[in-house]
């Protein structure tokens, strides 16, 4: 989608409300890749998504439509699916969008925060379910700096793939 002189690609950030520092790290990674790699090529990764769980619950139809319009989806987790399995539903929607050739979704990434001392069986089962998925890339991280670094690499890959496919605004 070309607007304002840039070829724009939406990146949906999905993070439970207790992971706002991680969400900020995701936004910072996208911003740095934009400034250093994407914008010189007239490409722009645009982060979208709501910051609070309640906002998502209150606007489910709009959030779902937002996911459907995105090219990339980043899901950050630590210990559960959020209230009423809210983030499980978003993750499954993103995977369905990626598998639908009529939609722009290209990749779904799960970022799983380390929980080395976790012993709760329900949380361990949740983490195993995520780790057993083979249909999406899994990034494991132990702090926000590590998350940001890994996402900068991923976003850089996306920019290079967009450029290789002929994306960007040509002068």
Where are these regions (language model features)?
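Conserved TIR/SEFIR loop-to-helix hotspot centered on a Trp-containing motif
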Residues: 79-100
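Structured N-terminal alpha/beta-domain signature
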Residues: 47-52, 78, 86-89, 112
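Alpha-helical scaffold elements adjacent to nucleotide-binding pockets in ATP/GTP-utilizing enzyme cores
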Residues: 25, 29, 62, 66, ...
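Short beta-alpha junction loops
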Residues: 53, 79-80, 104-119, 145
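C-terminal interaction surface of TIR/SEFIR-family domains
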Residues: 3, 112-171
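Hydrophobic/aromatic beta-strand patches that form the interior of the parallel beta-sheet core
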Residues: 74, 107-111, 139
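Conserved N-terminal substructure of TIR/SEFIR domains
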Residues: 1-76, 102-105, 169-171
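Extracytoplasmic/secreted cell-surface and envelope-processing proteins
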Residues: 21, 82-86, 120, 149
């Amino acid at each position: 989608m070309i607007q304002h002189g840039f070829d724009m690609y939406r990146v949906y950030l999905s993070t439970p409300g207790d992971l706002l520092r991680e969400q900020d790290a995701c936004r910072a990674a996208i911003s740095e890749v934009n400034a250093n790699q994407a914008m010189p090529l007239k490409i722009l990764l645009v982060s979208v998504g709501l910051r609070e769980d309640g906002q998502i619950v209150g606007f489910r139809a709009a959030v779902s439509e937002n996911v459907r319009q995105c090219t990339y989806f980043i899901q950050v987790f630590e210990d559960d699916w959020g209230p009423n399995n809210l983030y499980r539903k978003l993750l499954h929607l993103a995977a369905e969008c990626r598998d639908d050739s009529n939609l722009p979704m290209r990749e779904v990434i799960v970022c799983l925060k380390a929980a080395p001392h976790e012993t709760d069986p329900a949380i361990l089962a949740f983490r195993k379910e995520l780790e057993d998925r083979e249909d999406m890339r899994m990034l494991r991280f132990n702090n926000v700096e590590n998350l940001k670094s890994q996402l900068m690499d991923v976003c850089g890959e996306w920019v290079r793939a967009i450029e290789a496919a002929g994306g960007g605004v040509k002068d």
